[in-house]
Amino acid sequence: IAGPKSKELLISLTNSENPEQLFSNENFPWLSSKEIEINMIPTLAIRVAYTGELGWELHYPVEFQNKLLDLLLLSGKNFDLKLVGARAQNWLRQEKSYRAFGNELGRDACLVEAGLEKFINFNKEFLGKDALQKRNIKSKCVTLLIDGPKDCDPWGREAIYKDGKTIGRLTSGGYSV
């Protein structure tokens, strides 16, 4: 569930005694999770959205899939809920510079190369810290906004050139409006 009204939608569905407090930014910060109940469906809500907007991933037993979707759609009418597809979600994540496994993230790029060093605390010990500090950083993932020809259709894996030399590769691409 993602978007500016996602919190209100979840508040309307949860069985909590004080849902506003449960879903407050102080009690439910970004990248945290809580066990909640939606109409007696045990649900793990994770405060993260692939779109970069306010949102939650909902994890629940698969046998409740249809029931939960029906509840979300019914209650979602009051919040102008719209279903979106994977391409829309992918374009939204690109606009927010979110990285995707298989595109920007993979076995060949460390967090620094992926542009995610803000998630590394070098003041703490962690597995691989020494190797990461010694690693020769050869590339860096950055977000480019290209104001180019209207017939340009970037998708991913295209080479990036400067002065006739390949200087990188596009990992993801798409249009933004």
Task: List each language-model region with its residue ranges.
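Conserved, structured C-terminal
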Residues: 1-177
